[in-house]
């Protein structure tokens, strides 16, 4: 059975294996054991209540409960930009006009922004390609909403998610090549690695401070502004079905879109509800796949189960209860996947 749980120190080798499969552009999952170990420690200290809000971050893994295999990771940063500035570009417009010459030009322009400072961030979503089946991706991505719904007071009113931009298999980013490289004088993969390992001072030191007309970029770079890596398209679709939208903010490195949503308008958070759980044999029928989560902060668990999403009493097998670390009579959080999201 596939189950979501908090990360543990013993997961570092599994996370290293996942990091080796991501390719360039997933900044928050670098193939660096010291960085990943520090990330795990920060998550553990977050759960233990030892960190200020500016440093808090939760990390979860997807585990096969039968084999112990860990094929996926996802995370939530509680409040971005309160220690180190959180940069992106806002894609806006500057108008240049002359009535005398009968000229009017509205020019797309990039403005350096810290507008999302303090927002909670969905990040570090990666699922091993061999495990992208049977609803694992939905479970991995949406489990975070179940945690946020259960512990709403831990998070801020706005949630953002940076989507990986267009980068080819050789690490070539058209947006970086046309813009970032001119200021940073390094390859995309190097800048991405430095940022992922916490060495972010160079961003503030070298970033262009003035607005940039997108027409000055190559056509190839202009074409990928706000576009996602092909492997990231499904993740974007999942978030958009939950209510996230692109509001003209993009990543400063690869030009990928930043999606955002008010936390209380996220579908899975808004529609999830608590029901009593009982042990037994679930009723047979053509029921939709639903997310089921316990309400245990330190031992949080989420699984997928086929059931009636409107039920007031959820029947689960002994194995499902064990995976959720629940007992008959406990209350669990329940919400169905979106109607079009299939798990078979």
From Swiss-Prot:
Pfam families, sorted: AstA (PF04958)
UniProt function note: Catalyzes the transfer of succinyl-CoA to arginine to produce N(2)-succinylarginine.
This protein's UniProt keywords: Acyltransferase, Arginine metabolism, Transferase
Annotated EC: 2.3.1.109
Name of this chain's protein: Arginine N-succinyltransferase
Reactions that this protein is recorded to catalyse: succinyl-CoA + L-arginine = N(2)-succinyl-L-arginine + CoA + H(+)
List of catalytic residues: 229
Amino acids binding succinyl-CoA: 125
GO biological process annotation, one example: arginine catabolic process to succinate
Coiled coil residues, start to end: none
Keyword Acyltransferase assigned: yes
NCBIfam families the record matches: arg_catab_AOST (TIGR03243), arg_catab_AstA (TIGR03244), PRK10456.1 (NF007770)
InterPro entries for the chain: Acyl_CoA_acyltransferase, Arg_succinylTrfase_AstA/AruG, Arginine_N-succinylTrfase
GO molecular function, one term: arginine N-succinyltransferase activity
Recorded family membership: Belongs to the arginine N-succinyltransferase family.
Pathway where this protein functions: Amino-acid degradation; L-arginine degradation via AST pathway; L-glutamate and succinate from L-arginine: step 1/5
Transferase keyword on record: yes
